[in-house]
Amino acid sequence: MESRIVLDSRETSLLNTHKVLRNTYFLLGLTLAFSAVVAYISMSLNLPRPGLILMLAGFYGLLFLTYKLSNSGLGILSTFAFTGFLGYTLGPILNVYVSHGAGDIVVLALAGTAAVFFACSAYVLTTKKDMSFLSGTIFALFIVLLLGMVASFFFQSPMLYIAISGLFVVFSTLGILYETSNIIHGGETNYIRATVSIFVSLYNLFISLLNIFSILSNED
């Protein structure tokens, strides 16, 4: 009887994990599509790039709101508001590249982002490896990136920019590995929080690859 209860408990846990993973990827797909549409509208209307204060207020304000509402239906609306805002911020950035005939860099960054995401997801889902050991590395990288961004305000150096962008690529890649593993091992049971976490990693990854490819192309 006891072994049967344990087996039923494991089956229930496995079903819940699959449900969270399925819902996460479904919502992630919807938010990526929505963000792309908003970015396209932002580009078409030539909307200005938000200033630093608006960017920080919008990002962290909507992020906090989404996490606060993640256990309710309003969390989904907040998720779309958050990802839509990030889509809006992408519009002016992409316009700069397109207007300078650098659309190929945008495509390359997009392809690189997709490749990293699918490779990381496939690796974790195939191996079922527990990536919780990455948490310390991710935190350390966050501190280094924070210091690097502060330094970039005082030192205008292409090498510093490319170093920060390179670290962001590593940081975002590890974030995808960690969050995917966290879902399949039951560490994250809320698909809204999981979606936002992966979305932010993809956003940072895309922007970082754009910066790297742009700097490298200018040096040629």
From Swiss-Prot:
Bilayer-crossing regions: 25-45, 50-70, 74-94, 105-125, 135-155, 158-178, 196-216
Keywords: Cell membrane, Membrane, Transmembrane, Transmembrane helix
Chief place where the protein resides: membrane
Gene Ontology CC, one term: plasma membrane
Bilayer disposition of the protein: Multi-pass membrane protein
Cell location: Cell membrane
Keyword Cell membrane: yes
UniProt xrefs under CDD domains: YccA_like
Record bears the keyword Cell membrane: yes
The family this protein is said to belong to: Belongs to the BI1 family.
Name of the protein in its database record: Uncharacterized protein PM0402
Source organism per UniProt: Pasteurella multocida (strain Pm70)
